[in-house]
Amino acid sequence: METCYCIEPQWPADELLMKYQYISDFFIALAYFSIPLELIYFVKKSAVFPYRWVLVQFGAFIVLCGATHLINLWTFTMHSRTVAVVMTTAKVLTAVVSCATALMLVHIIPDLLSVKTRELFLKNKAAELDREMGLIRTQEETGRHVRMLTHEIRSTLDRHTILKTTLVELGRTLALEECALWMPTRTGLELQLSYTLHQQNPVGYTVPINLPVISQVFSSNRAVKISPNSPVASLRPRAGRYVAGEVVAVRVPLLHLSNFQINDWPELSTKRYALMVLMLPSDSARQWRVHELELVEVVADQVAVALSHAAILEESMRARDPLMEQNVALDLARREAETANHARNDFLAVMNHEMRTPMHAIIALSSLLQETELTPEQRLMVETILKSSNLLATLINDVLDLSRLEDGSLQLDIGTFNLHAVFKEVLNLIKPVTLVKKLSLTLHLGLDLPVFAVGDEKRLMQAILNVVGNAVKFSKEGSISISAIVAKAETFREIRVPDFHPVPSDSHFYLRVQVKDTGSGISPQDIPKLFTKFAQTTVGPRNSCGSGLGLAICKRFVNLMEGHIWLESEGLGKGCTATFIVKLGIAEQSNESKLPFTSKIHENSIHTSFPGLKVLVMDDNGVSRSVTKGLLVHLGCEVTTAGSIEEFLRVVSQEHKVVFMDICTPGVDGYELAIRIREKFAKCHERPFMVVLTGNSDKVTKESCLRAGMDGLILKPVSIDKMRSVLSELIERRVLFETS
């Protein structure tokens, strides 16, 4: 009997397969049920997922698939009809849901693919933005380095410090192995190694400036990569075991240095450049980047500007010492000029007073002699003395006026005056001379010329008298015509003078005065000289007597009145035309302003004598005191004199109607004396009229007299006619005062 040692299996093969299917269906169902749970969890966490219904369908499909696998566990054995119905229902639902999901995916998948495309696009854009941000950061870093380097370079104006600082800062910022600067020699044919980063005193290597590599760099305004073996790049000895780093070179313009004589710099007749060479570390894979090259270019430009400023500073420092010496000399000359000017003014002030005092005696006594019985020969001599004295007084006035015009102390005395009366008075003053010389004298006043105007009456009359007087002086025969009109705007176009710019206005007008004569004429080349002080013509009859001050003073008066004066003549023997234009204000009211300070000379005075008028004269100069007393006695006045302040205060009384005093008195000046008189006579009608008799003709004296309460001012010298006119005016004012 055969024995079988076979081991019976624990489970039959069919049963084993069945168990595997059970287990597989169970895990499949478990997986199908877990997937929807995971989808639901992640969908709830996502706030922007756009396909929620698709996930619901897909989840239902998976759940139904899992359910079919779960139900299938009961179909491997005998099962009831109910299980079959459930299984069938589950499969039908699974089929429906799966088909619906499949149809939905047909529409969803393209969108999902486009989402992926947009994702890739966004990734590319993000990468591009990252690159741009990196570029911006690089540019910001470059800008920061440029600002830092510029600050370091501009922190000094010493050119050696500028160049050394540039190399040090570039080497630190760019981590350079070496940096050098080649400067052109004085001949301009070579470049010399002048500054390096690591060598304190580099050996003066030179290379020809016409090397191709140098020409290449100089012809470009950008940084240029050059060979490490180039002569300008061989800055340090290299062993053969390593590879040299990359080298760039850039030109440095030497701006405007040809204008400055810098001793050890090249003579730059044309545009020249220095050469800056920069070397990266050896045995490294580092290369020059774009922003580093831009940094080098910007720094080269900044170095050029800084060197230009340094050159300017060196030249200014070199020129400073001579300028300081000149300033010291100019300051000394200014002080000397001021001292001389003060001395001149003091001299003129003293001479003015001291010269007018004897002139006062001469003119006063001569005028007194004229009114006595004289033989024709004696009268002629007295008239000659009087005319010469008046001429000398005029010269004194001219010199003083010119002095004050030159130092700017003379100012116009503006007031309202009768313009027509000024011309008539000039005519009356000039007519006697023209009658003697048998000259025809005519005056034409424009119909539109205002009767009253605002300006300086005295200076205007002086200017007219100067011009007319010159015409009379240099005319032996013929005629002289004076015309005065309001200058129109079209006449200004004829005058082409840079300093004369008339501006029409409703508040002022321009007076045009023209004087024509048929006299000796002027050579054209002499016309410009006539407005220079002490200048006279050198040819022709105009080289006659005169101080040469009249037209010079007249021109300055016209300039003060914002006008212009000029002469015209066709030549010698053809006469002359003098024209001037001055600016005058338009008077608001047609009445002549009364200036209490100015004594006006009335030729036809109401009173020819003043019998019984008590007058007190105070003057420390005995001659002047006696002369003034003589004039007043001749006019019938009862005169009391005083030679000092004490005597004056002792004798002055209410009986005295007029007081003549000299303000230049030792001890107490006339201004303080006037104040004492006002204090002594409290009531105005008891106080005598106070008239200053002085040789000081400046405006300050007049203003001081006005502040002190003076009633009038008379300039020495004084003639008998002038004294008669002054007393007539004072008597009129006294009568008017008492009746008021």
From Swiss-Prot:
Cu cation binds at residues 65, 69. The lineage of its organism: Eukaryota, Viridiplantae, Streptophyta, Embryophyta, Tracheophyta. The chain crosses the membrane at residues 23-43, 53-73, 92-112. It holds the Pfam family Response_reg. Binds 1 copper ion per dimer. It catalyses: ATP + protein L-histidine = ADP + protein N-phospho-L-histidine. This is Ethylene receptor 1. InterPro entries: CheY-like_superfamily (IPR011006), ETR (IPR014525), GAF (IPR003018), GAF-like_dom_sf (IPR029016), HATPase_C_sf (IPR036890), His_kinase_dom (IPR005467), HisK_dim/P_dom (IPR003661), HisK_dim/P_sf (IPR036097). It comes from Cucumis sativus. GO terms for biological process: negative regulation of ethylene-activated signaling pathway. Belongs to the ethylene receptor family.
